[in-house]
């Protein structure tokens, strides 16, 4: 027998009252995006559960994808069979022969939404339980916490059988908590920050600063690959590439070395905030971890934050590096993050950056530059790409292939 569909149960949606259907519709769309790599799979959702109809797709691969989608409490693979007692009996026997091992206990849990079916739930439990005893005479029944709980559901159109419940990712459907701009470098921390924001339902757009020729096409592709890894948790993500070369050269020419990192981060924050405003975001998200590097002291954060009143979410701010690495490995971003491509935060990094920068000093150095013009030109030059779970070969890939 082959699975016909996957029955999906919701996570925290039960607490959402009148907004429940909005959350469900968002989750359905997210599941559809994530499963778009399986062309034959179709997704539907109602108030109580969602269904992914396999239509011949490989169940194992689809299940692995579903495990990552935020908003799913658990799911069960389902067999669809003809709605007749004899077919149900033979199907139950076939399933039990496949999965039963010596010493296992079982029970049958039946329910019916089709009340015209010839047996009620109690009678169906007894009839199908008897069929199991015919197939496996020594099997034991256990009503509480059996090894096998074979669930039977009689609906209008057919009967459905399942015995396995697989834990989902939990959390909230991506997009139900509003939009945030993720400052995505190519490092370990920012993808983890993005993942944690996604888990709480934030629809992220990835803002990446590129400084060609100082940063390479490989660095850009690395950031896009990290973004693609994050799409498996809630669907497509907008990747926003910001041209940053002019600003970095201006900072390098007109500011003391100790303040290069502070000013660089202040410009990044301004630009991200401007993009957020244009694209109707609510917050900025970054991968800062307190004390990990010079730009992540409380004094530095204060000096950098001073350019915006927008809330800054720092999901990894209290984590040790090893804790962040553990999550990066779990979500499969670590190996990409450690690829040896320079990002724009490292190319002009000073040997001894200021760890307690003063806002008034930063403002004094910025007065030497056309801050507003630099920001406006950077925002005007952004390039937006929709990143999907399935990689598509593009010009950057071709260029990398040629270089290699």
Curated annotation (Swiss-Prot):
Top-level EC class as recorded in UniProt: transferase
Subcellular compartments: Cytoplasm
Protein name per Swiss-Prot or TrEMBL: Probable tRNA sulfurtransferase
GO cellular component: cytosol
Residue ranges of domain THUMP in the record: 60-165
Organism expressing this protein natively: Streptococcus pneumoniae (strain Hungary19A-6)
Organism placement in taxonomy: Bacteria, Bacillati, Bacillota, Bacilli, Lactobacillales
Gene Ontology BP terms: thiamine biosynthetic process; thiamine diphosphate biosynthetic process; thiazole biosynthetic process; tRNA 4-thiouridine biosynthesis
Cystine bridges: none
Catalytic function, reaction form: [ThiI sulfur-carrier protein]-S-sulfanyl-L-cysteine + a uridine in tRNA + 2 reduced [2Fe-2S]-[ferredoxin] + ATP + H(+) = [ThiI sulfur-carrier protein]-L-cysteine + a 4-thiouridine in tRNA + 2 oxidized [2Fe-2S]-[ferredoxin] + AMP + diphosphate; [ThiS sulfur-carrier protein]-C-terminal Gly-Gly-AMP + S-sulfanyl-L-cysteinyl-[cysteine desulfurase] + AH2 = [ThiS sulfur-carrier protein]-C-terminal-Gly-aminoethanethioate + L-cysteinyl-[cysteine desulfurase] + A + AMP + 2 H(+)
Pathway(s) the chain acts in: Cofactor biosynthesis; thiamine diphosphate biosynthesis
Family recorded in the similarity comment: Belongs to the ThiI family.
CDD domains recorded: PPase_ThiI, THUMP_ThiI
Keywords: ATP-binding, Cytoplasm, Nucleotide-binding, RNA-binding, Thiamine biosynthesis, Transferase, tRNA-binding
Pfam families linked to this entry: ThiI, ThiI_fer, THUMP
């Amino acid at each position: 027998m082959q699975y016909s569909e996957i029955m999906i149960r919701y996570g925290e949606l039960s607490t959402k009252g009148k907004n429940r259907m909005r959350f469900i519709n968002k989750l359905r769309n997210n599941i559809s995006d994530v499963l778009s790599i399986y062309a034959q799979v179709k997704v539907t959702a109602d108030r109580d559960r969602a269904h992914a109809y396999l239509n011949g797709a490989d169940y194992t691969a689809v299940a692995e994808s579903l495990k990552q989608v935020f908003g799913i409490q658990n799911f069960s693979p389902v067999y669809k069979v003809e709605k007749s007692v004899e077919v149900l009996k033979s199907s139950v026997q076939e399933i039990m022969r496949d999965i039963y091992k010596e010493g296992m206990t079982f029970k049958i849990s039946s329910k019916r939404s089709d009340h015209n079916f010839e047996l009620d739930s109690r009678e169906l439990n007894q009839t199908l339980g008897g069929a199991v005893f015919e197939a496996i005479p020594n099997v034991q029944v256990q009503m509480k916490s059996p090894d096998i709980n074979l669930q039977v559901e009689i609906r209008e159109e057919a009967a459905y059988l399942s015995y396995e419940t697989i834990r989902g990712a939990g959390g909230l459907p991506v997009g139900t908590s509003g939009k945030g701009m993720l400052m995505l470098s190519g490092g370990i921390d920012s993808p983890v920050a993005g993942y944690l924001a996604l888990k709480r339902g934030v629809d992220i757009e990835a803002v990446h600063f590129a400084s060609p020729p100082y940063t390479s096409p490989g660095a850009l592709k690395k950031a896009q690959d990290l973004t693609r890894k994050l799409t498996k948790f809630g669907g497509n993500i907008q990747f926003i590439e910001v041209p940053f070369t002019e600003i970095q050269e201006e900072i390098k020419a007109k500011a003391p070395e100790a303040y290069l990192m502070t000013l660089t981060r202040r410009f990044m924050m301004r630009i991200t905030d401007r993009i957020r405003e244009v694209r109707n975001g609510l917050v900025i998200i970054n991968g800062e971890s307190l004390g990990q590097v010079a730009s992540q002291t409380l004094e530095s954060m204060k000096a950098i934050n001073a350019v915006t009143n927008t809330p800054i979410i720092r999901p990894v701010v209290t984590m040790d590096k090893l804790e962040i690495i553990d999550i990066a490995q779990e979500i499969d971003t670590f190996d990409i993050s450690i690829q040896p491509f320079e990002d724009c935060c490292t190319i002009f990094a000073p040997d001894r950056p200021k760890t307690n920068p003063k806002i008034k000093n930063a403002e004094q150095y910025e007065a030497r530059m056309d801050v507003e013009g630099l920001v406006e030109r950077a925002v005007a030059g952004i390039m937006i790409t929709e990143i999907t779970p399935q990689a598509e070969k593009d010009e950057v890939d071709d260029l990398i292939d040629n270089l290699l």
